[in-house]
């Protein structure tokens, strides 16, 4: 334990100011996202909508990535990842303001599409931005730390989000499940997103050449479109596995176990904590077993964790949800680092956008179908489908060549 702690402190001491700025952004944006993740479905319910509408909104957001994912990648390669990230954050703020003030369902759907577009632009730009400020030998570590930065703060956001409606209701004299309470609570995420933009507003310094890198690695030939697509393929099934459940995660724990908003917030906080710890867990495993093998087997482990959620007791279900977060959180930074390592710098925007497109496609279709399935058969088929999708995504990683 002492050795691990010493290694961690040494690794953190080697991080450049550019990396610390990105980590600060990820923590703040992760805090904002955790609030919207918990409260938006409750907001829809307070407006009188049901699970199928929640699935529709999730599908609309992910469809934006599906439709605009490739143009987003071209934009990132054209204007640069930092400018793209800032543009995405500004658009995200404007779209959320419009969403909360929209007078009708159709206006909300349009605003949600813009929210999805902005989110895809922001998160897609972050991947090549990180790849551009670190050398190959540090990439897995930095990607894991960045995933942890955004996810470890998630429990704080989930707990705050669970308490915000009650606190706001007391302040304005309404009920904790009233529209006004949820609307004002969601507005806090808009403020946090604006603060998250501050660390990345200033340009990043040019990365010095890596003295340990070979000339062949520095001058890698361009990959064909199909080669890049093959590296991104695992994202499709990862999107399916997330889309069938994550848009409904709060409704699952509320409806299946009768939990309050605050209790649901605690459960989601544990999952976010698992995601954050997973990012740290994946770093030493990737170093020991390689990015491909570690990423693939860690994602495979998410399947039995999902099956644990079939147990009709809150503690086993919550434990399964935590473990799912742990294994997914450990696997996806390794897969992202693997793709960026295999892709020449001039194609990283394309590679990141393809991962986003496939992930969005899987999520959008899965969320829409899942909302319909739940109305007739409940959550059991959803959990089984997620497990199968995690297995398929893991196999897609394991079938890649080398690290």
Task: Enumerate the predicted regions with their spans.
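Helix-breaking motifs and short loop linkers at transmembrane-helix boundaries and internal kinks
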Residues: 80, 101-106, 258, 311-316
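Central cavity-lining transmembrane alpha-helices of secondary-active solute carriers
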Residues: 56-74, 269-281
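Juxtamembrane intracellular "pre-TM" segments in multi-pass secondary transporters
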Residues: 2-16, 204-234
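Helix-loop boundary and gating motifs at the non-cytosolic
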Residues: 8-63, 227-267
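Helix-to-loop junctions at the C-terminal end of transmembrane segments
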Residues: 68-80, 165, 278-291, 374-375
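Structural signature of the two symmetry-related core transmembrane helices
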Residues: 83-98, 293-308, 384-387
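C-terminal membrane-cytosol helix-exit motif in multi-pass small-molecule transporters
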Residues: 166-169, 190-211, 396-401
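Conserved MFS/SLC helix-loop-helix module at the cytosolic interface between two early adjacent transmembrane helices
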Residues: 67-103, 286
């Amino acid at each position: 334990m002492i050795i691990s702690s010493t290694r961690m402190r040494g690794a953190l001491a080697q991080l450049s100011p550019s990396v610390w700025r990105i980590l600060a952004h990820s923590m703040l944006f992760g805090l904002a996202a955790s609030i919207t993740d918990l409260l938006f479905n409750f907001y829809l319910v307070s407006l009188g909508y049901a699970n199928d509408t929640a699935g529709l909104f999730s599908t609309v957001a992910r469809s934006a990535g599906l439709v605009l994912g490739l143009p987003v990648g071209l934009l990132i390669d054209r204007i640069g990842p930092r400018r793209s990230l800032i543009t995405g954050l500004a658009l995200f703020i404007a779209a959320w303001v419009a969403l909360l003030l929209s007078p009708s369902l159709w206006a909300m759907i349009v605003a949600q599409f813009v929210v999805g577009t902005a989110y895809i632009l922001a998160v897609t730009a972050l991947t090549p931005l990180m790849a551009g400020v670190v050398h190959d030998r540090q990439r897995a570590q930095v990607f894991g730390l960045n995933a942890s930065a955004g996810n470890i703060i998630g429990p704080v956001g989930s707990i705050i989000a669970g308490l915000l409606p009650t606190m706001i209701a007391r302040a304005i004299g309404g009920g904790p499940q009233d529209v006004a309470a949820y609307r004002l609570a969601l507005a806090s995420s808009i403020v946090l997103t604006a603060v998250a933009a501050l660390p990345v507003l200033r340009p990043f310094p040019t990365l010095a050449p890596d003295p340990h890198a070979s000339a062949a690695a520095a001058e890698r030939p361009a990959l064909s479109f199909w080669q890049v697509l093959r590296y991104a393929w695992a994202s499709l099934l990862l999107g399916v596995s997330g889309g069938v459940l994550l848009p409904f995660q709060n409704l699952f724990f509320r409806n299946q176990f009768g939990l309050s908003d605050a209790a649901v917030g605690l459960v989601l906080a544990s999952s976010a904590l698992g995601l954050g710890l997973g990012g740290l867990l994946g770093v030493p495993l990737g170093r020991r077993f390689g990015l491909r093998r570690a990423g693939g087997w860690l994602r495979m482990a998410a399947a039995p964790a999902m099956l644990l959620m079939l147990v009709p007791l809150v503690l086993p279900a919550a434990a399964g949800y935590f473990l799912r977060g742990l294994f997914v959180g450990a696997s996806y930074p390794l897969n992202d680092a693997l793709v960026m390592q295999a892709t020449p710098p001039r194609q990283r925007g394309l590679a990141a956008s393809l991962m986003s497109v496939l992930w969005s496609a899987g999520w959008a279709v899965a969320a829409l179908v899942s909302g319909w399935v739940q109305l007739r058969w409940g959550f059991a088929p959803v959990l089984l489908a997620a497990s199968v999708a995690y297995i398929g995504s893991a196999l897609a990683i394991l079938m890649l060549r080398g690290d």
